């Protein structure tokens, strides 16, 4: 059984509808996105007189829940796709996927298939980290699949009759990458005949979350100043492009080195920096992958755009850069009072590696309740509380 195909399920609070999905994360390959397909089990009583629908929604939330109580809505649906699963509409019958066939055999005649194809221009799942005192749902882009009944797909339903699941749209690092970033600068100081040269480079273009980043620093100090401080910072730049032109820059890693470079000397060294969410828990507005407070959440991955894609529909764009900064000053007690900064910037692409291809050829299907884990190891029941309210 452990080698079976894992399937996730979520049941409505009234127990009448259960939605099954093969995965929680759906990969955006830039040219296409993995289809969202699954099965929905409907109580026989519902099948007699009710229509049952499945809907997938991509939404952008850019305000707090409590503001909606006074009539202000800070949620915008970017993309909505729905289908009627019962009674099935004529002419819409599609071939079942291999996993749907296994689920159909396991779940019986009260189960019905559904499938959605995401548009390629949708944003990936991103959450903006709230501050310590913030409450309610976090701002960001999320995807939801829900099963519900009603006379019409637009009908407002009781939360007790809805089975809702939050899924994620993710991007993985491409199998091929470009040239490793490199930058250099030459700085001429007053009272010095020769300049200071700073050169910085990375070993590769794409880095994975949690992987140490090697920053190669080369300094040719032909001046009469002393380089007293070398600082390397990793910055996250978040462009909120859907409703405004807001841009947020957050330092996610900062390392100050004790190395010094004397006047008229050269210096070469490779440093390691590792930006981690664990060191940035309190930073409000930091972009994270997917929904917050889950054990598999990390700093947001760099956004990859298809050529010609409209950036505005992407909602939130995330990028990173590494800054290498030198503080140069004259010797003596008063030297630091007239110090000068010399810096270069390197682009950084931070992503997840593409996981190994899974298999759905096993005979058994392992069904797991659709619940992620909080960072503290407790079940995330935020959605269940909302549905029961």
Swiss-Prot record:
Coiled coil: none
GO terms for MF: G protein-coupled receptor binding
One GO process term, biological-process aspect: G protein-coupled receptor internalization
Tissue/organ expression: Retina and pineal gland.
Top-level taxon of origin: Eukaryota
InterPro entries: Arrestin, Arrestin-like_C, Arrestin-like_N, Arrestin_C-like, Arrestin_CS, Arrestin_N, Ig_E-set
Gene3D superfamilies: 2.60.40.640, 2.60.40.840
Pfam families: Arrestin_C (PF02752), Arrestin_N (PF00339)
PROSITE patterns: ARRESTINS (PS00295)
Similarity comment: family membership: Belongs to the arrestin family.
Function recorded in the entry: May play a role in an as yet undefined retina-specific signal transduction. Could bind to photoactivated-phosphorylated red/green opsins.
Protein's name according to its UniProt entry: Arrestin-C
Organism of derivation: Aquarana catesbeiana (American bullfrog)
Phylogenetic classification of the source organism: Eukaryota, Metazoa, Chordata, Craniata, Vertebrata
């Amino acid at each position: 059984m452990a080698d079976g195909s894992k399937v996730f399920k979520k049941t409505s609070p009234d127990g009448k509808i259960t939605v099954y999905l093969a995965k929680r994360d759906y990969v955006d390959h830039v040219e296409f996105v993995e289809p969202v397909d699954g099965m929905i089990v409907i109580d026989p009583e519902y099948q007699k007189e009710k229509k049952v629908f499945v809907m997938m929604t991509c939404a952008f939330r850019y305000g707090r829940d409590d503001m909606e109580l006074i009539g202000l809505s800070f949620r915008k649906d970017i993309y909505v796709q729905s289908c009627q699963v019962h009674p099935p509409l004529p002419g819409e019958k599609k071939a079942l996927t291999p996993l749907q066939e296994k689920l159909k055999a396991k779940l019986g005649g009260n189960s019905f298939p559904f499938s959605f194809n995401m548009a390629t221009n949708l944003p990936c799942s991103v959450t903006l980290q709230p501050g310590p005192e913030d409450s309610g749902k976090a701002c960001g882009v999320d995807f939801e699949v829900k099963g519900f009944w009603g006379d019409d797909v637009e009908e407002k339903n009781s939360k007790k009759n809805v089975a809702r699941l939050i899924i994620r749209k993710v991007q993985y690092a491409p199998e091929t990458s470009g040239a490793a970033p490199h930058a250099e600068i030459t700085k001429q100081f007053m009272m010095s005949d020769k300049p200071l040269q700073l050169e910085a480079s990375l070993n590769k273009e794409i880095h994975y979350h949690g992987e140490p980043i090697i920053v190669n620093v080369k300094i040719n100090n032909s001046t009469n100043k002393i380089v007293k401080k070398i600082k390397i910072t990793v910055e996250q730049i978040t462009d909120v492009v859907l409703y405004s032109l807001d841009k947020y820059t957050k330092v996610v890693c900062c390392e100050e080195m004790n190395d010094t470079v004397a006047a008229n000397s050269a210096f070469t060294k490779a440093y390691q920096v590792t930006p981690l969410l664990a060191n940035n828990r309190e930073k409000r507005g930091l972009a994270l992958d997917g929904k917050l407070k889950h054990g598999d959440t990390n700093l947001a991955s760099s956004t990859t755009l298809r050529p010609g894609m409209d950036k505005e529909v992407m909602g939130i764009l995330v990028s990173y850069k590494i800054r290498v900064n030198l503080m140069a000053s004259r010797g003596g007690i008063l030297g630091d009072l007239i110090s000068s900064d010399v810096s270069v910037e390197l682009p950084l692409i931070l992503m997840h590696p593409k996981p190994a291809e899974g298999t759905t050829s096993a005979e058994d299907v392992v069904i797991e309740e659709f619940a992620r884990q909080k960072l503290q190891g407790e079940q995330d029941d935020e959605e269940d509380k909302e549905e029961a309210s």
